[in-house]
Amino acid sequence: MHVRVRLFAMQRELAATREVALELEPGATIESAWDALVGLNPLLGPGRAAVRFARNGAYADATDVLEEGDELAFIPPVSGGAPDSEDTPGRDTRSGAGAARRIIELRATAFGPAILDDLADRLATPADGAVVAFLGRTRETPGTPAPGQEVEARRHAGRAVDELEYEAHETMALAVLGTIADEIAARFGVQRLAIVHRLGAVPLGEASIAVVAVSPHRDAAFGAARYAIDETKARAPIWKAERFEDGHVWVGAPARTGPADVEG
């Protein structure tokens, strides 16, 4: 049985390749595919505790049995972590909460200065009285290194970040963002939402993510925007490297494969 493994971020660097073809016995599981990969690339082995699995573009369990031609991704720690608040504002169930509109994008080019206004204009209807927008920017202060990156982080301790660089499993990332939008509609009743994320190099002070939630009422819009950014950072297969003059550090935490209050 033949399967294809795609490698990203720190795994890609450790293995010095973006893709590996594996030949496995019939009935092999995702876990056994990981073991075979580590057999070919032993440097990947210490990262097992922080790895999450994906099969054909969706999160999967280590015990899932593989089929001929499957595409696997062993997801290293993603760009963010779990939310720092468990507040859950109310759901918008009042009139005018319909008319679903979504903007889910990954962009390789810089955002314009009016991106939040542009997104709000594309989403809002006459029934909407609330627009909540979030813009994430590159800061000079380093973040928390991903598991396995601690030594490299210490080498750059005390230095300012020059720029960020983002990498993604693009088709899977778009699917995860769409799922997050579905959850927002179910939890908060917010049907008009934008999540736009940069890829590639993002210099100091430039924006890397824009989130806009539009609703008739503010409580639902605030909750939707917060949920969108927290879940994107925790679950989307998007990786972030902090770049310095003489090297880089991958930052983040092991990916969550579902909502924090459901994953168990």
Positions of the model-derived regions?
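Ubiquitin-like/PB1-type beta-grasp interaction modules and other compact soluble beta-rich domains
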Residues: 1-87
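N-terminal, polar/charged subdomain of small-to-medium soluble alpha/beta proteins
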Residues: 4, 8, 12-14, 71-77, ...
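Short, conserved charged micro-motifs
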Residues: 29-32, 219-223
